[in-house]
Amino acid sequence: MNLKDIAKIINSDFSGEYFEITKMNTLRDATKSEISFVANAKYIKEIQNSNAGAIIVSKDTKEFVPSGCVALVVENPYWEMATLSKYFAPSIEDETLPEPKIGEGTTISPRAEIARGAIIGKGCTIMAHVYIGTNAVIGDNTIIYPSVTVYRDCRVGSECIIHANTTIGSDGFGFATNKQGEHRKIYQNGNVEIEDNVEIGSSTTIDRAVFGTTLIKYGVRIDNLVQVGHNCVIGEHSVLVAQAGISGSTTMGRNVVMGGQSATAGHLSIAPFTTMAARSGVTKSIDKSGLTFAGFPLLEHRLWLKLQAKIARLIKQN
């Protein structure tokens, strides 16, 4: 899409050199042929270091756009990013793509549907009512149980097991809101990648990234009814127990354990070998590895146990 057309769509005055923009991306990852945005002044350093060809900004952050990068000034960058995301959304299905490629020894139920452009490796088992989307890739020896959906462009590694009714790559919960309180969808144009030797329980949802990838690393174990938000990274051999909820853009180190019904806020970082007891609520990043936490507000587990004992004594005294 030409930058001239983009400027018109988002109502930005621009009179510089026009060139083609191929996709939207983050400030950190965007290249000269890509466009990004900034909706918060706390990302000034990221603006200054960005290699994006163009950045959607407010008048307050325009001055921080580096030379050689086009600043598209608008009143509400987040809203206009949402507007533009629709124009870069790929087709849900593409009939021009080749027929799916199926590896040797793979068994596919006649009641499953495999979209064009998909690739399924050797020795897989694909059961009834499974849908594998356009350009999705399934590795070797992976088992996919009934009614699983793997959306377009998503990748599942080898030796994985995905249980019934799980959804891989549905849209993340992303929308912009204007001054009038109206909402506008942010089209989620990234994907999900699940590395090798991952097992995912029934009725779990892993959302696709806005840009880039939601990543489930090697050896992760995910229980039933777990929600993983867009752009999350779940570290190697981590364990997410039933009804855990991981908000968008949270990054976990390896061997993190999230107990049942525990949850995180978004945009957090959790150190390796951290354990959250059931129903823990994580609102801040955890930098020190190897600790166990419980409760809400979150406390180290031993302090939480002491607090519960004191509360019990107070109740007994009264």
Swiss-Prot record:
One of its GO terms (biological process) is lipid A biosynthetic process. Keywords: Acyltransferase, Lipid A biosynthesis, Lipid biosynthesis, Lipid metabolism, Repeat, Transferase. It comes from the Bacteria. GO terms for cellular component: membrane. Pathway: Bacterial outer membrane biogenesis; LPS lipid A biosynthesis. The active site is at 230 (proton acceptor). Homotrimer. Catalyzes the N-acylation of UDP-3-O-acylglucosamine using 3-hydroxyacyl-ACP as the acyl donor. Is involved in the biosynthesis of lipid A, a phosphorylated glycolipid that anchors the lipopolysaccharide to the outer membrane of the cell. PANTHER family: UDP-3-O-ACYLGLUCOSAMINE N-ACYLTRANSFERASE, UDP-3-O-ACYLGLUCOSAMINE N-ACYLTRANSFERASE 1, MITOCHONDRIAL-RELATED. Belongs to the transferase hexapeptide repeat family. LpxD subfamily. This is UDP-3-O-acylglucosamine N-acyltransferase 1. It comes from Sulfurimonas denitrificans (strain ATCC 33889 / DSM 1251) (Thiomicrospira denitrificans (strain ATCC 33889 / DSM 1251)).
